């Protein structure tokens, strides 16, 4: 923000990002902006998403996440799921890794992870982590909590809020994005399950 305010009015934002890209810890300008230069925006967005996920799931019926009516008995879907779910998990991992140097990142990887979870729910594959308990609470909060912890440590050690140590920018961003991927995937899957239950209850 300070760099933009003090820059020549004729200098574009793209140029400013490119001149500081090497210090960001990643090679892709969008990831650099979202996880470094404007990381507090992303932190707030994740906080809103966590609150939305907790609220949505708290409105679903108690114990309903294990109800069998959300599952399909379609044998073709069940057979395809055993092939597609591992491929989707690999795709999510690739999108997460690719985000440092090309389009991708935690949000896209989390969406694919949630889609894999939806397919698992529909075919009856185990999804115990979406049931109420410590695993669900940890998954929902892990990304935001670690993001906030990194921000707080930076501020307490004399740097700006969410300013990473230069030598640790890349590894810290990778850790944050990995945990954000898991949290985003769990939140989206939880909202899908909660919405399906409410639709069934309204009929």
Give residue ranges: language-model regions.
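Alpha-helical transmembrane segments of multi-pass membrane proteins predominantly involved
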Residues: 1-203
């Amino acid at each position: 923000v300070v760099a933009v305010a003090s820059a020549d009015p004729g200098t574009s934002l793209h140029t400013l990002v490119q001149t500081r890209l090497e210090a960001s810890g990643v090679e892709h300008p969008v990831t650099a902006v979202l996880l470094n230069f404007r990381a507090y925006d992303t932190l707030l967005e994740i906080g809103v998403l966590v609150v939305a996920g907790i609220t949505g799931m708290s409105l679903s019926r108690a114990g309903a996440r294990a109800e069998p009516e959300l599952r399909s008995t379609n044998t073709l879907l069940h057979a395809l799921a055993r092939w597609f779910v591992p491929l989707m998990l690999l795709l999510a991992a690739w999108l997460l890794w690719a985000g440092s140097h090309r389009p991708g990142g935690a949000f896209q990887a989390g969406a694919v992870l949630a889609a894999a979870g939806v397919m698992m729910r529909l075919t009856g594959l185990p999804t115990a982590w979406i049931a109420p308990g410590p695993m669900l609470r940890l998954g929902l909060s892990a990304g935001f909590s670690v993001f906030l912890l990194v921000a707080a440590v930076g501020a307490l050690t004399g740097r700006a809020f969410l300013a990473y140590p230069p030598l640790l920018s890349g590894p810290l961003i990778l850790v944050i994005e990995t945990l954000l991927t898991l949290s985003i995937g769990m939140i989206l899957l939880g909202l899908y399950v909660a919405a399906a239950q409410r639709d069934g209850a309204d009929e």
